[in-house]
Amino acid sequence: MRLPILIINFKAYREAAGKRAVELAKAAEKVAKELGVSIAVAPNHLELALVAASVDIPVYAQGVDVEKAGAYTAHVALENLREAGAVGVILNHSEAPLKLNDLAKYVEGGKAMGLDVVVCAPDPLTSLAAAALGPHAVAVEPPELIGTGRAVSKYKPETVVKTVELVSAHFPNVAVITGAGIESGEDVEAALRLGTRGVLLASAAVKAKDPYQKIMELAKPLVAAGPP
């Protein structure tokens, strides 16, 4: 995982369905190349292989619910993700929470397969517990702010700061990123100033009238943040 990073979660938005997922990913790819920054996209499972085959930037899966491929109807296994072209996976998003034992298995399994592993958590202490599992990054996202336009970096900066302090002190090799309500370049800049190494966002980019321009705005603060 190249840091700092902007991760765009397509969720199941109609604006990022089918060919629109590729168009959105290509807009992100264009910005990444023009600015020289790290941008990853997380399309819906249905579009994952299509997007992965269409762009050169990192493509992450939005989640997983089976460790190994096999007779699991309507499930998605870690092996399936890798075969589809994913290079990373987001785990334990508040919209797709996991039991601790499953989360631990998926973190270990994902890393063993060479996937970037990002674990979401709602608060500093849970983020610390998630970091103990050894992912590449934890994304602290207060669920009450997700999708509200009220950026965590402005409305709950203490949550971000505490998470950075705890994780950095105990698991310095685990990056802290943040999300929830991120809508603007200013929000991203504020998050980076608080000590994070990136942001995870969705609707700000996916629902933008001009995704390219919006992603450009959101990604520009990464340039100044520079490598670790």
UniProtKB/Swiss-Prot annotation:
This is Triosephosphate isomerase. One of its GO terms (molecular function) is triose-phosphate isomerase activity. The active site is at residues 93, 141. Substrate binds at residues 9-11, 146, 181, 202-203. Its EC number is 5.3.1.1. Keywords: Cytoplasm, Gluconeogenesis, Glycolysis, Isomerase. Involved in the gluconeogenesis. Catalyzes stereospecifically the conversion of dihydroxyacetone phosphate (DHAP) to D-glyceraldehyde-3-phosphate (G3P). It catalyses: D-glyceraldehyde 3-phosphate = dihydroxyacetone phosphate. Belongs to the triosephosphate isomerase family. HAMAP family: TIM_A. It is found in: Cytoplasm. The keyword Isomerase applies. The keyword Endoplasmic reticulum does not apply. Homotetramer; dimer of dimers. It is an enzyme of class 5 (isomerase). GO terms for cellular component: cytosol. GO terms for biological process: gluconeogenesis; glyceraldehyde-3-phosphate biosynthetic process; glycerol catabolic process; glycolytic process. Pathway: Carbohydrate biosynthesis; gluconeogenesis; Carbohydrate degradation; glycolysis; D-glyceraldehyde 3-phosphate from glycerone phosphate: step 1/1.
